[in-house]
């Protein structure tokens, strides 16, 4: 058995799989069982009770940021392009960027577009859609208010959504962060998810919550949000 495998098993053995941990205890335990040197990301997995017609999708700005700055690409023309440039977008353009992306360029993390550009940007659907980067009004990435869009993205606004199995996977901290700040991010995220409860849903909305670190085992969370 590899040294890495032994360390994982040792960490795994410290987690009681039959127990529901408070978020405070779970965060402390993740740090206690950490066995790698790099700064691990802390992730959450929420299993929701959803019907086929239900959609859970939104964006959030966590109170305590931890991710590296995103490279923001904005499709805009004229005054809108000047506005995007003034507020710090990384790349701004129209047909030139569309052609560049078609040629295989992909050095960007978020895509924003003004409404008048969407007809042209739509040609990039197969490319941007595969990366989950297609601009969408629901995620506030199709807008004429570039100031607010860019500023919120620079602050870390991130999309979350439930997959076809009703599971939301999301990163909300780093192991190097103060426990209280990790918990604050957790609380804010859960609060935003609960707001997306479908109005016609009967019974519990959240079935289960687990958190884990990049290399560590998952820990089941005790929760009261329904």
Swiss-Prot record:
* Superkingdom: Bacteria
GO BP annotations, alphabetical order: regulation of translation; translation
Q: Cross-referenced Gene3D superfamilies, in alphabetical order?
A: 3.30.190.20, 3.40.50.790
A GO molecular-function annotation: structural constituent of ribosome
Q: Which PROSITE patterns match?
A: RIBOSOMAL_L1
Entry-linked InterPro entries:
Ribosom_uL1_bac-type, Ribosomal_uL1, Ribosomal_uL1-like, Ribosomal_uL1/biogenesis, Ribosomal_uL1_3-a/b-sand, Ribosomal_uL1_CS
GO CC annotation terms, alphabetical = large ribosomal subunit
Q: What does this protein do?
A: Binds directly to 23S rRNA. The L1 stalk is quite mobile in the ribosome, and is involved in E site tRNA release.
Quaternary arrangement and interactors, per the entry? Part of the 50S ribosomal subunit.
> What family is reported?
Belongs to the universal ribosomal protein uL1 family.
UniProt-recorded name of the protein = Large ribosomal subunit protein uL1
Q: Which organism is it from?
A: Borrelia garinii subsp. bavariensis (strain ATCC BAA-2496 / DSM 23469 / PBi)
């Amino acid at each position: 058995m590899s040294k890495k495998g032994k360390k994982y098993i040792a960490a795994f053995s410290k987690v009681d799989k039959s127990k529901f941990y408070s978020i405070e205890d779970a965060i402390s335990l993740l740090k206690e069982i950490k066995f790698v040197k790099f700064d691990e990301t802390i992730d959450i997995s929420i299993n929701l009770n959803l019907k086929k017609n239900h959609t859970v999708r939104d964006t959030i700005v966590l109170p305590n940021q931890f991710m590296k700055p995103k490279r923001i690409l904005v499709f805009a023309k004229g005054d809108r392009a000047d506005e995007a440039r003034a507020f710090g977008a990384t790349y701004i353009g129209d047909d030139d960027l569309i052609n560049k992306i078609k040629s295989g360029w992909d050095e960007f993390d978020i895509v924003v577009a003004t409404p008048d550009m969407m007809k042209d940007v739509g040609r990039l659907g197969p490319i941007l859609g595969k990366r989950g980067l297609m601009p969408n009004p629901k995620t506030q990435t199709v807008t004429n208010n570039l100031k607010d869009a860019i500023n919120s993205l620079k602050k870390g606004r991130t999309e979350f959504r439930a997959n076809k199995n009703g599971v939301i996977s999301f990163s909300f901290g780093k192991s190097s962060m103060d426990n209280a700040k990790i918990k604050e991010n957790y609380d804010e995220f859960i609060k935003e998810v609960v707001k997306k409860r479908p109005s016609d849903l009967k019974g519990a909305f959240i079935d289960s919550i687990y958190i884990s670190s990049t290399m560590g085992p998952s820990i089941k969370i005790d929760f009261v949000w329904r």
